[in-house]
Curated annotation (Swiss-Prot):
Family: Belongs to the polysaccharide deacetylase family.
UniProt name for this protein: Chitooligosaccharide deacetylase
Annotated Gene Ontology cellular component terms: cytoplasm; membrane
Site positions for Raises pKa of active site His: 146
Residues annotated as binding a divalent metal cation: 77, 81
Domain (NodB homology) ranges: 19-211
A Gene Ontology molecular function term of the record: metal ion binding
GO biological process, any: carbohydrate metabolic process
Known function: Is involved in generating a small heat-stable compound (Nod), an acylated oligomer of N-acetylglucosamine, that stimulates mitosis in various plant protoplasts.
Gene transcribed to yield this protein: nodB
Active-site residue numbers: 26 (proton acceptor), 172 (proton donor)
Length: 214
């Protein structure tokens, strides 16, 4: 069945003429972090792909609109970020359908072509449902574990140690709904934000281009 293969990197022969790395951001939009991420991407004139949680898109539609208007990809990361392996088929289908609707409601002009399972945990039900909606399932090939707040240098070093042409880099702009201490939300992703410029500059110094997913 179409789109049942999970994408963890982009075939360099099928991609752009120049070697590319693909930055992706999960769990947003986040009113404290997403605007600053977008500012940094704009400063460097690069595009990325944002895997947004539908519940967050409902609360922050303006950020979804900004993501799209500034030329980035917006993608499905389910409605409430559950572990799909613990969900029934109807629950899986509802999570994916409702997230798509929330994104389109927030930004009617959005083109949703990709989906990423929360925690990277795919199920047959999720893959079949994604295929029925024409969504390509995306994993990642580079994970600096920025969600664990290991330090800016660690995030940068882990990306640079693993990145190569076609790599899909996993970063985060928020966390699962309700998972973080509310008092820490304003600074939750400060390390990720601080790392982005260094990552972009270093990848470019290697002759790599940063783009949103094709």
């Amino acid at each position: 069945m179409k789109n049942l293969n999970i994408i963890d990197s982009v075939d360099v022969d099928a991609g752009a003429d120049d070697p590319c790395v693909y930055l992706t951001f999960d769990d947003g939009p986040n009113p404290f972090c997403t605007p600053h991420i977008l500012d940094v991407l704009a400063q460097h004139a690069v595009s990325a792909t944002f895997f947004v949680i539908g519940a967050n898109a409902e609360v922050h539609p303006g950020l979804v609109q900004r993501i799209v208007s500034e030329g980035h990809g917006v993608a499905n990361h389910t409605m409430t970020h559950p572990d799909l392996a613990t969900c029934s088929r109807p629950q899986v289908e509802r999570e994916i359908d409702e997230a798509n609707r929330a994104i389109i409601s927030a930004c009617p002009g959005a083109s949703i072509r990709h989906i990423r399972a929360p925690y990277g945990k795919w199920t047959e039900e999720a893959l079949v449902k994604s295929a029925s909606l024409g969504l390509a399932p995306v994993h990642w090939s580079v994970d600096p574990r920025d969600w664990s707040c290991p330090g800016v240098d660690a995030i940068v070093d882990r990306v640079l140690a693993a990145a190569k042409p076609g790599s899909i880099v996993l970063l985060h702009e928020d966390g699962p709904p309700g998972a973080a201490d509310p008092t820490k939300l304003p600074t939750l992703r400060d390390q990720t934000l601080a790392a982005i410029s260094a990552i972009i500059k270093s990848l470019r110094s290697r002759g790599l281009t940063i783009r949103s997913l094709p």
